[in-house]
Amino acid sequence: MISAAGIKVYSYLNITAVADFFMEIKPGEHGRVTLRGYLAGMPDVGRLQEEAVRIMLQEDGDNREQVLFHGIIQSVHTFVENGVCQVILSALTSSIRLDQEERNRSFQKTKETYLGIMREVAGNVSGSGLSVETGVPVIQYRETDWEFCRRMAAGAGQVLYADPASPEIRLWAGLEEKGGTASFPADRYSVCVDETYYHMKSAGEGKKEFLYYRTE
């Protein structure tokens, strides 16, 4: 069982406890996390965007920590409620770095595999079903590397995932055996709180802390 109390956040922010937590991993999208936490004091928000954040899970009755999420902070909202400093933080997996600049490339070798092309573009790529020759020249035109890799995975009949636990850019397509990180089924498993709740919190509204699971 996962509880908000078992989640620890390591970043420039000094988050002492997590109140609410939302994590979503979907095929073809960057993994994302939104959380609300309590702060020891107000941070320098100006330097937070693009900072790394590591989120660990400590399971009930076990002192060992497992990596739940490792990514890049996208937005930070701090506020004070009832005299307590709080933060609402959102972050995306490191794969977001592949999705910032459109590029043009050509791959003319028809015997090159989808996996080989994707590794040339994104580096650490793995998964089933990608070791298939394209059979035709491949063009990347006005696509980010993320968009291109997603299209390449689809060309091989697979869907693309970003590894939520890796501090570096790491992608896989199809099925993959994993170990050493917190385990989640690969296909559309979410640990959520309703996103409207965070808008309510940023407006100073109160609501009982909660956590729920969603399988799509």
Give the location of each predicted region.
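Well-ordered beta-strand positions in beta-sheet-rich domains
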Residues: 20, 66-72, 88, 102-104
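Juxtamembrane "anchor/assembly" segments of surface/extracellular structural proteins
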Residues: 1-50, 56, 90-96, 158, ...
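Short, structural beta-strand-to-alpha-helix junction motif
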Residues: 111-114, 144
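Residues forming anionic-ligand binding surfaces in small-molecule and nucleic-acid pockets
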Residues: 89-100, 104, 117-131
